[in-house]
């Protein structure tokens, strides 16, 4: 027996951990009108343009910002928390985007996000995918890239958070100093890194 459009849609949402985009629905042959109808019936909740979720679903900020800024990468203090280098849960999230990326729509509706702009040559250095604390895949910078970002942006970052992150990394067993050094060379940060590594190693 063939599934109805509604059943097909709900099946896809369950596979997607409780969310679906308009694009994904259209790819299944499900028109926007069906999404609208289910929203009116309160079987779905519209999170933002193009993103829907089950009413019971907890839409976390990591998911929201990842959807609104698909090319954004969680970085700095946010990456440090996600990587276990900081115990300070972010109240304001930090994302890195390429110079020229338009994030004005998100900035106009959310005041808990900081965007850092980077040259495209540095954008992919250390980019990885991890599972967020809420169980969904998100883009984030690895520990080594995060250390360099923190050093570069030291004047903006809370001194206690900065100190915790730097000390946690250099005292940790998972540090990769070769990778850190390679990143520093690529990002022209050898001298800045040396100031900290010589003291902490």
Give, region by region, the residue ranges found by the protein language model.
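Short acidic, hydrophobic short linear motifs in intrinsically disordered regions
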Residues: 15-28
């Amino acid at each position: 027996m063939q599934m109805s459009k509604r059943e097909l849609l709900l099946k896809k949402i369950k596979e997607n951990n409780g969310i679906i985009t308009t694009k994904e629905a259209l790819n299944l042959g499900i028109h926007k009108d069906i999404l609208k109808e289910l929203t009116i019936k309160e079987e779905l909740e519209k999170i933002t343009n193009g993103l829907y979720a089950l009413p019971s679903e907890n839409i976390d900020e990591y998911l929201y910002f990842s959807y609104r800024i698909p090319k954004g990468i969680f970085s700095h203090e946010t990456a440090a928390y996600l990587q276990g280098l900081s115990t300070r849960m972010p109240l304001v999230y930090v994302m890195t985007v390429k110079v020229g990326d338009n994030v004005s729509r998100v900035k106009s509706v959310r005041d808990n996000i900081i965007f850092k702009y980077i040259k495209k040559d540095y954008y992919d250095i250390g980019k990885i995918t991890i599972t967020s604390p809420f169980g969904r895949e998100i883009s984030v910078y690895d520990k080594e890239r995060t250390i360099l970002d923190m050093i570069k942006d030291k004047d903006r970052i809370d001194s206690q958070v900065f100190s915790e992150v730097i000390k946690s990394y250099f005292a940790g067993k998972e540090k990769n100093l070769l990778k850190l050094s390679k990143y520093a060379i690529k990002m022209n940060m050898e001298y800045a890194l040396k100031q900290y590594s010589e003291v902490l190693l």
